[in-house]
Curated annotation (Swiss-Prot):
PROSITE patterns: GIDA_1, GIDA_2. It comes from Haemophilus influenzae (strain PittGG). NAD-binding protein involved in the addition of a carboxymethylaminomethyl (cmnm) group at the wobble position (U34) of certain tRNAs, forming tRNA-cmnm(5)s(2)U34. This is tRNA uridine 5-carboxymethylaminomethyl modification enzyme MnmG. FAD binds at G13, G14, G15, H16, A17, G18.
Length: 629
């Protein structure tokens, strides 16, 4: 049975990737359908109730800079905000919000239901319809067929998902939700390379059974950060603290004594788990020299009694989980509300994707989120946004768009996945980016909002606000450049009181601000440089641009060198077997990866500079040497 309407884009899945993937083409004007097995779990935070963190906060800001939802929802739901690495340089500072699960889900659903060009339908997708290697639509469990020109699959952990608690296991996409078994079988039939990964979650604890009085309290920042460039502190709900406890030798003994009942340590689980979010049993065994691990007790919401014990993800049996929880300070009488578990699921080799997240073998089919081997809400959202954009562009047969590594953390994420692939759940870190001084949270809008405007992703209100900010930055920099202070100035004594060393030669406001002891606030407290600008975002950009000017210019020079051939395109039909001078190993790797550019080829393990030179020579000989944008 065919559904009465035809869509431009269909998105399967209503998680963090799916919601961004559906909103993006709808904002661009494409008729979009979001297909989900349960409309009540749209935007569900399946694991930890938090958004952001090191590297992850950068992704949230980038999604927001292009009109995405995650930052807005985090502002509406954040019950504790912190800036991580606040004492370090601006490149690695990151925003993190503890979120109320219910408020977050409400914010997501409200945005989806009020988005023009977007329909939502509750039904499990069981098949992707393909004709002549081109996607044509989706069929559902009840036999309903939806026609579309492009499809974005964001299945999360649902593809052949299997939940493990102790040595017991059962099919499931997450606790309380069924797995997508039929869809998994269909995708395997398409010949895409598939493997298994696993992730886990800790037991949830009843807050009424925790003795908070004897635990260390962790408050959020006094000056509350805001995630969205369009947001304000007024968006935030009531702020509440988290608490800290620790595992101890008794905890570790409980774990060691029950490893024979662990699905991980008995070989029942075959999928590889996230390296940077290990289970508590993994931590105890891998770091056997440590007799304690810090555990954060994070509230799940303002109206919920559930507490998320961040740091004790486990798949051990329920009685062992009780032993672990009750062995810790403040949790001696704690009661578990929901058991922890591990989940195994299918993921597909991201090297089979273009950097647009379209599959190489099936035109119009895009993958985003955990199906590509990533872990984390933020990584999923960034991929969803990118896949949604390109699903829309594909419909109009327009040139695809994807960010470069020097342009965004999303670009780093996608390039890593599509070039190198992954054998374990991939998460973003600032250390993965070569040009992280340029890829800061604070300048995500400067990097990406003009592109978003060109693509039709943002409204005129956001565009006007962005342009006003850019104008404020330029005007203030020009003002500081034009005001000079000289050694005979009547304001010299006032200035010398705040300068580390007396002024001996004429200096502009920019020159003074470059001094390590000087800040914008101090500078604009001096009579010649009053008044301070009120636009705090613009102030931040002015101060960073001036103080880090030398470092920024150096990185930009490095980027220009790299870009010389970074975007030189390699045609899809380029035959490496006809290129003389390449070793069999290099030829095989290039055929396997099918890089789309010289830059991507150069990052494949084992591809030497000599091999890159040979390819460039052959591209030139064959008249194929074209520079990308």
């Amino acid at each position: 049975m065919f559904y009465t309407e035809t869509y431009d884009v269909i998105v399967i899945g209503g998680g963090h990737a799916g919601t961004e993937a559906a909103l993006a083409p709808a904002r661009m004007g494409f008729k979009t359908l979001l297909l989900t097995h349960n409309v009540d779990t749209l935007g569900q935070m399946s694991c930890n109730p938090a958004i952001g963190g090191i590297g992850k906060g950068h992704l949230v800001k980038e999604v927001d800079a292009m009109g995405g939802l995650m930052a807005h929802a985090a502002d509406k739901a954040g019950i504790q905000f912190r800036t991580l690495n606040s004492s370090k340089g601006p490149a690695v500072r990151a925003t993190r919000a503890q979120a109320d699960r219910v408020l977050y889900r409400q914010a997501v659903r409200t945005a989806l239901e009020n988005q023009p060009n977007l329909d939502i339908f509750q039904q499990e997708a069981t098949d992707i319809l393909i004709e002549q290697d081109r996607v044509t639509g989706v069929s559902t469990k009840m036999g309903l067929i939806f026609r579309a020109k492009s499809v974005v699959l964001t299945a999360g952990t649902f593809l052949a998902g299997k939940i493990h608690i102790g040595l017991e296991n059962y099919e499931g996409g997450r606790a309380g939700d069924p797995a997508s078994v039929n869809l998994s079988h269909r995708l395997r039939d398409l010949g895409l390379r598939v493997n298994r990964l696993k992730t886990g979650t800790p037991p949830r604890i009843d807050a009424r059974t925790i003795n908070f009085d004897i635990l260390a309290k962790q408050h959020g920042d006094e000056v509350l950060p805001v995630f969205s460039f369009m947001g304000s502190v007024d968006d935030h709900p009531q702020q509440i603290p988290c608490y800290i406890t620790h595992t101890n030798e008794q905890t570790h003994e409980v774990i060691r004594n029950n490893l024979d009942r662990s699905p991980m340590y008995t070989g029942v689980i075959e999928g590889i788990g996230p390296r940077y979010c290990p289970s508590i049993e993994d931590k105890v065994m891998r770091f056997s020299d440590r007799n304690s691990h810090q555990i954060y007790l994070e509230p799940e919401g303002l109206t919920s009694n559930e507490v998320y014990p961040n740091g004790i993800s486990t798949s051990l049996p329920f009685d062992v989980q009780m032993g672990i929880v009750n062995s810790m300070k403040g949790l001696e009488n704690a009661r578990i509300v929901k058991p922890g578990y591990a989940i195994e699921y299918d993921y597909f080799d991201p090297r089979d994707l273009k950097p647009t997240l379209e599959t190489k073998s099936i035109s119009g089919l895009f993958f985003a989120g955990q199906i590509n081997g990533t872990t984390g809400y933020e990584e999923a959202a960034a991929q969803g946004l990118l896949a949604g954009i390109n699903a829309g562009l594909y419909v109009q047969e327009k040139d695809a768009w994807y960010p470069r590594r020097d342009q965004s953390y999303t670009g780093v994420l996608v390039d890593d996945l599509c070039t190198l692939g992954t054998k374990e759940p991939y998460r973003v870190f600032t250390s993965r980016a070569e040009y992280r001084l340029l890829l800061r949270e604070d300048n995500a809008d400067i990097r990406l909002t003009p592109i978003a405007h060109e693509l039709g992703l943002i409204d005129e209100a956001r565009w006007a606000r962005f342009n006003q900010k850019m104008e404020n930055i330029e005007q203030e920099r020009q003002r500081l450049r034009s005001i000079w202070l000289h050694p005979r100035s009547e304001y010299l004594e006032e200035a010398n009181k705040v300068l580390g060393s007396p002024l001996v030669r004429e200096a502009s406001g920019e020159d003074l601000l470059r001094r390590p002891e000087m800040t914008y606030d101090i500078l604009t407290s001096l009579t010649p440089y009053k008044p301070a600008m009120e636009d705090k975002e613009a102030v931040e950009q002015v101060e960073i641009a001036i103080k880090y000017q030398g470092y920024i210019e150096h990185q930009q020079e490095e980027i220009e060198k790299q870009k010389r051939h970074e975007n030189t395109a390699i045609p899809a039909n380029f035959d490496y077997n006809k290129v003389s001078g390449l070793s069999n190993e290099v030829r095989a790797k290039l055929e396997q990866h099918r890089p789309v550019s010289i830059g991507q080829a150069s990052r494949i393990s084992g591809i030497t500079p000599a091999a890159i030179s040979i390819i460039l020579v052959n591209l030139k000989k064959q008249g194929m040497l074209k520079r990308g944008e």
